[in-house]
């Protein structure tokens, strides 16, 4: 199976170079029309069928329809912008059920956008989006329409909360307007789901919703967030100098793309010897950055990229920019008004569980109506992507079925989230196969297996990069 996938990916890359998809940076569809600023947030500016079929692990997905929508939105400061979202209609579509899926793009260049990377014939640079698409397939199999926003927006503002949250909400607004061609009812129920970088966008969306998109209250039925990113500083502390250090230049450039003063300070502080690496962080997609810059030190060690080390975070510009994008720092008026599931691996080596714990406690103390925390003792960040996905899907299915969510706050610690109640055998077998394909291990196979998953993941994506 692995050999077949690698061969198909190789063929798709060659095919793309000959016939290929036009990248967003060169595709006029991604540019808004003159006068677009007069449209309301959530209005659809352009519509087209996806240039190529959606695909997962470089294999085309059979669906009834797939469209790209250019949607009016706003940046963090309320300035008008426009972004693309992909709306997929499955063969057995239920017009009253829609899932907003926030992909873990985790990059700061528009050519890494999910709308591009999720298509058949997309380049190998977007291999992580092809992996992420494996989580969308079972949603489609269940008959749910799925909207996947390029929530980072036209500037690719990775880790910027308000931009991401607003775009997510505006993609839902837009999807609910498409009934004339998609069949989606304006009264459709909507669930949100995001893991890792996608959890950041999802978390901000449900936190902003009551103020920014109050009319969606009747549509939204819940949100599942996994590998929950609530504190980007803690992520930097966790990955600096590790095999995952490639996240840091991506995140810093994502912030720089939204905040000009931050960008000026960032490139003024980085050592000349590290400037090239930092600049490539604004050009590389996730896989290339992880493979290209493992073990790099930005804030620690004698050869760190920033002479001031962690002291740089005390700089006024750095501190304000980062504080503005910490979900943990939002006040009580941003309390989510929908049921929430948090699922997280205890030994998450990228997004420490302590900050998901902190967010859980904050929301509970503020009286959230329904919040469930499913902690997985045996999973790190990569493993929980697939160990936790069946739990998230089961939880979403329960919301669509009208089953009551937990009342108040409930925390459960399991040896593996594969043991989450209600997971169907079919879904478990599906994710078991994905886990074996990418990691070579069974779902929930224990801490010892998890320790080797990072190496297997890197080996997998190196075959594409």
From Swiss-Prot:
Function: Secreted lipase that is able to hydrolyze both the neutral triacylglycerols and the monopalmitate ester Tween 40, allowing the use of hydrolyzed products as carbon sources. Has broad lipolytic activity, which may be important for colonization and subsequent infection, therefore contributing to the persistence and virulence in human tissue.
Native organism taxonomy: Eukaryota, Fungi, Dikarya, Ascomycota, Saccharomycotina
Xref: InterPro entries: AB_hydrolase_fold, Lipase_secreted
Top EC class of this enzyme: hydrolase
Residues in the signal sequence: 1-16
Native source species: Candida albicans (strain SC5314 / ATCC MYA-2876)
Protein name from the UniProt record: Lipase 10
Keyword terms, alphabetized: Disulfide bond, Glycoprotein, Hydrolase, Lipid degradation, Lipid metabolism, Secreted, Signal, Virulence
Primary location recorded for the protein, binned into one broad class: secreted
Keyword tRNA processing: no
Repeat in keyword set: no
Reaction(s) this enzyme catalyzes, per UniProt: a triacylglycerol + H2O = a diacylglycerol + a fatty acid + H(+)
């Amino acid at each position: 199976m692995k050999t077949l996938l690698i061969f198909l990916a190789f063929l798709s890359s060659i095919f793309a170079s000959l016939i290929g998809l036009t990248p967003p940076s060169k595709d006029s569809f991604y540019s808004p029309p003159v006068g677009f600023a007069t449209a309301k947030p959530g209005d659809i500016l352009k519509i087209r069928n996806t240039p190529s079929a959606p695909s997962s692990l470089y294999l085309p997905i059979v669906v009834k329809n797939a469209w790209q929508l250019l949607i009016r939105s706003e940046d963090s400061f309320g300035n008008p912008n426009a972004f693309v979202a992909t709306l997929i209609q499955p063969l057995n579509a239920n017009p009253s059920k829609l899932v907003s899926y926030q992909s873990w793009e985790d990059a700061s260049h528009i050519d890494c956008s999910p709308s591009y990377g999720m298509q058949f014939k997309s380049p190998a640079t977007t291999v992580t989006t092809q992996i992420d698409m494996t989580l969308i397939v079972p949603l489609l199999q269940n008959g749910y329409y799925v909207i996947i926003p390029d929530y980072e927006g036209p500037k690719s503002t990775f880790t910027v909360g308000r931009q991401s949250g607003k775009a997510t909400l505006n993609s839902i607004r837009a999807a609910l307007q498409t009934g004339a061609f998609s069949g989606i009812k304006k009264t459709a129920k909507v669930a949100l789901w995001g893991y890792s970088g996608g959890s950041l966008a999802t978390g901000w969306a449900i936190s902003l919703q009551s103020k920014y998109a109050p009319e969606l209250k009747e549509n939204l039925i819940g949100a599942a967030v996994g590998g929950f990113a609530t504190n980007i500083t803690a992520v930097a502390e966790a990955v600096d100098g590790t095999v995952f250090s490639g996240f840091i230049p991506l995140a810093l450039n994502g912030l720089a793309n939204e905040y000009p003063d931050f960008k000026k300070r960032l490139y003024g502080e980085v050592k000349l010897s590290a400037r090239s690496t930092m600049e490539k962080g604004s050009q590389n997609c996730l896989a290339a950055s992880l493979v290209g810059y493992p073990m790099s030190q930005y804030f620690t060690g004698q050869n760190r990229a920033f002479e001031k080390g962690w002291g740089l975070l005390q700089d006024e510009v750095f501190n304000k920019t980062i504080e503005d994008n910490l979900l943990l720092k939002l006040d009580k008026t941003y309390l989510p008004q929908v049921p929430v599931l948090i699922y997280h691996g205890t030994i998450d080596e990228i997004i420490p569980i302590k900050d998901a714990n902190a967010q859980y406690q904050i929301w509970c103390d503020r009286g959230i109506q329904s919040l469930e925390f499913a902690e997985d003792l045996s999973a790190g960040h990569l493993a929980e992507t697939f160990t936790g996905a069946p739990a998230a899907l089961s939880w979403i299915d329960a919301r669509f079925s009208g089953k009551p969510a937990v009342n108040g706050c409930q925390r459960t610690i399991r040896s593996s989230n594969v043991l989450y109640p209600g997971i169907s055998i079919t879904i478990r077998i599906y994710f078991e196969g994905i886990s074996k394909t990418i990691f070579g291990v069974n779902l929930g196979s224990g801490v010892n297996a998890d320790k080797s998953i990072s190496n297997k993941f890197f080996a997998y994506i190196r075959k594409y990069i």
